[in-house]
Curated annotation (Swiss-Prot):
Function: Removes the pyruvyl group from chorismate, with concomitant aromatization of the ring, to provide 4-hydroxybenzoate (4HB) for the ubiquinone pathway.
Protein name: Chorismate pyruvate-lyase
GO cellular component, one term: cytosol
GO molecular function, one term: chorismate lyase activity
Quaternary assembly: Monomer.
Similarity comment: family membership: Belongs to the UbiC family.
Binding positions for substrate per the UniProt entry: M35, R77, L115, E156
Reactions this protein catalyses: chorismate = 4-hydroxybenzoate + pyruvate
Taxonomy of the source species: Bacteria, Pseudomonadati, Pseudomonadota, Gammaproteobacteria, Enterobacterales
InterPro entries the record matches: Chorismate--pyruvate_lyase, Chorismate_lyase_/UTRA_dom_sf
Record-listed E.C. numbers: 4.1.3.40
Gene name linked to the record: ubiC
Length: 165
């Protein structure tokens, strides 16, 4: 099963450099902290609608593959992050199978828990980069994060109801 927001997320085109944008827009797009937490700061109840979760092969992650180690399988999680039931963000997380060891095995068991609630409680979290993307008037971003030095790629598309707009 897919969702139109995830199709648009995969269509994001990324800027080579951080574009000169309104400071409020950049504040959202370059946020280093948890987007879940930022949404909750808007006074909203945040929930996850699961679209897809499971192992995939390289041919299912062509956009992410150049940014991750080449492996036989990857854990893919596609969700809508909702605020008071309204979708504000589409998220796609790709995790190499080699990342799924030790405490990071929990990435497979998040269920309806927002990824940010797990990631931003880890003292081993680092971020390699944030890239800003755009498609058809919507903004997004992708980040390569590391847990205990092990990579994962998170792509987020801000949906029209999001306070980013």
């Amino acid at each position: 099963m897919s969702h139109p927001a995830l199709t648009q997320l995969r269509a994001l085109r990324y800027f080579k450099e951080i574009p000169a944008l309104d400071p409020q827009l950049l504040d959202w797009l370059l946020l280093e902290d948890s987007m879940t937490k930022r949404f909750e700061q808007q006074g909203k109840t945040v929930s996850v609608t699961m679209i897809r979760e499971g192992f995939v092969e390289q041919n299912e992650i062509p956009e992410e593959l150049p940014l991750l180690p080449k492996e036989s399988r990857y854990w893919l999680r596609e969700i809508l992050l909702c605020a008071d039931g309204e979708p504000w963000l589409a998220g796609r997380t790709v995790v190499p199978v080699s990342t799924l060891s030790g405490p990071e095995l929990a990435l497979q068991k998040l269920g309806k828990t927002p990824l940010g609630r797990y990631l931003f409680t880890s003292s081993t979290l680092t971020r390699d980069f944030i890239e800003i993307g755009r498609d058809a008037g919507l903004w997004g971003r992708r980040s390569r994060l590391r847990l205990s030095g092990k990579p994962l790629l998170l792509t987020e598309l801000f949906l029209p109801a999001s306070p980013l707009y």
